[in-house]
Amino acid sequence: MLMPKRTKFRKQQKGQFAGLSKGATFVDFGEFGMQTLERGWITSRQIEACRVAINRYLKRKGKVWIRVFPDKSVTKKPAETRMGKGKGAPDHWVAVVRPGRILFEVANVSKEDAQDALRRAAAKLGIRTRFVKRVERV
């Protein structure tokens, strides 16, 4: 699973979700992509499940790019623990996504294959997404 090798601080605050995605809003590497329509957290397990779903559907054809990285730690306190006594230990890693963010890109496959593969991957996520094509930018 994806996680940072080293971070400056082990624990992070929850943060804010307001606004649209600042970067990665266009398909830059492949021909087709999956773009978010909602904001939320995507865990490293969800990213891995999407990657496996895309690769299994495309088999050896095409190339896949993952455009998100889980760089935020989420903490959790043990079960049946009373409130207080500090923040819990880091439990898993998430990527913060806002509307407009490209999550995955694929290339060297037909539009139908890319659409099916990305639809299967979208089923693994807890947020709404859409299929987008590459547009030429000046």
From Swiss-Prot:
Pfam families hit by this protein: Ribosomal_L16
Keyword Flavoprotein attributed: no
Superkingdom of this protein's organism: Bacteria
UniProtKB keywords: Ribonucleoprotein, Ribosomal protein, RNA-binding, rRNA-binding, tRNA-binding
GO biological process assignments: translation
InterPro entries: Ribosomal_uL16 (IPR047873), Ribosomal_uL16_bact-type (IPR000114), Ribosomal_uL16_CS (IPR020798), Ribosomal_uL16_dom (IPR016180), Ribosomal_uL16_sf (IPR036920)
GO cellular component, one term: cytosolic large ribosomal subunit
SUPFAM superfamilies, per the entry: Ribosomal protein L16p/L10e
UniProt GO MF annotations: rRNA binding; structural constituent of ribosome; tRNA binding
Subunit composition and interactions: Part of the 50S ribosomal subunit.
Similarity comment text for this entry: Belongs to the universal ribosomal protein uL16 family.
Described purpose of this protein according to its UniProt entry: Binds 23S rRNA and is also seen to make contacts with the A and possibly P site tRNAs.
Protein name: Large ribosomal subunit protein uL16
Organism listed in the record: Chlamydia trachomatis serovar L2 (strain ATCC VR-902B / DSM 19102 / 434/Bu)
Biological classification of the source: Bacteria, Pseudomonadati, Chlamydiota, Chlamydiia, Chlamydiales
